[in-house]
Amino acid sequence: MQKTNRDYPFIHNNEIIEWDIKSANTSLMRYYGLQPDKVIDKLASMPKSQREISVGKLMRKDKDFAKSLEESFNKIIQEFMDTNNLTWDDIVSVKKDAVFVKNHGIQKSEFGAVHFIPKNQYKHVLLLPKYEIYISNEKTDVK
């Protein structure tokens, strides 16, 4: 579902919050029952880089699991949007494991094992053909 709302190429003086899924792979596996708890617990105990490599190996080994995990990202993003009554006008961009929301309060950020956390806050966004530039008072991020 990765998509950017290009209706507004420059957003100025708005509250834009990046809502990121914490430990996305393992939390989605747990929420949707994609792996046994024992496997998920083992993965969750690993450092992030090792966990990502291990999940990648699981996905290469089991194509059905890989497809289910990829679909789970779309499902949980849609659930987050529906539950919080977000329309496309409220969205700046949707990434694999994050939603950039402008000027809209979030009422529910936890869905079982899946936790959306406010990772970054910005005031301005410039959407270019190949880049998204997010600007706050403290920093500039290019996505």
Where are these regions (language model features)?
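Conserved acidic
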Residues: 1-143
